[in-house]
Amino acid sequence: MSTDTHDVVEELLRRMAEGDHDRTAALFAEPVDWLLSWPAEGHPAVPWIQPRSSRAEVADHFRSLEAHHVPELNGTSVTRILVDGTHAVVLGEIVQTVRAEGTAYTSPFALHLTVEDGLITRYHIFEDSLTIARALSTQISP
């Protein structure tokens, strides 16, 4: 596997798209600097919003995402990958459908990654958390 930042980012996106959670997690260093742009307390409708630092936790994150969405209706797209040394920023749009209610949502995203020695040491994603929480909130009974 290449240690080039752009190559590692491309491989991450490929493995994520394939739904290969363990192989996706294998691209991450331990510990990983993990940040999702959500309030610290998270949201009860969005169970994957929690701290992560190990490969097992990273794999669990992607499994949880898949469990709550319809993979066949995923229309997430990447519009740009910007690389500066060990840093990369991936820009795009998340297009997902919630499995439980069939609610579709879209959100722009920016993903800041750092790659060192061929492993991802930073995973910071910024997305429209309000839109996502609203789409998943239909699963919660009042």
Please identify what each model-predicted range represents.
Residues 1-2, 47, 51, 102:
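Alpha-helix initiation/capping motif
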Residues 30-83:
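A solvent-exposed, acidic/Ser-Thr-rich amphipathic alpha-helical stretch
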Residues 66-142:
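A beta-strand edge to alpha-helix "cap/lid" segment located at domain peripheries
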Residues 1-30, 140-142:
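Short, low-complexity N-terminal intrinsically disordered segments enriched in polar/charged residues
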